[in-house]
């Protein structure tokens, strides 16, 4: 688990999981 959430990395990881996009909330990657 990263301490700092990079929005671009989060977004790409969420896309790979089949989600539309990801955003960082309190340094945690949330997929939508």
Curated annotation (Swiss-Prot):
Family designation: Belongs to the short scorpion toxin superfamily. Potassium channel inhibitor family. Alpha-KTx 10 subfamily.
Keywords assigned by UniProt, alphabetized: Disulfide bond, Secreted
Taxonomy of the source species: Eukaryota, Metazoa, Ecdysozoa, Arthropoda, Chelicerata
Descriptive protein name: Peptide II.10.10
GO cellular component: extracellular region
Note: Negative results: has no effect on voltage-gated potassium channels Kv1.1/KCNA1, Kv1.2/KCNA2, Kv1.3/KCNA3 and Shaker IR (with inactivation domain removed) and on intermediate conductance calcium-activated potassium channel KCa3.1/KCNN4. Does not show antimicrobial activity as well.
Notes concerning its domains: Has the structural arrangement of an alpha-helix connected to antiparallel beta-sheets by disulfide bonds (CS-alpha/beta).
Species this protein is from: Centruroides tecomanus
Disulfide bonds: 5-24, 10-29, 14-31
Claim: Disulfide bond is one of the keywords in the record: yes
Compartments in which it is found: Secreted
Tissues showing expression: Expressed by the venom gland.
Superkingdom, taxonomy of origin: Eukaryota
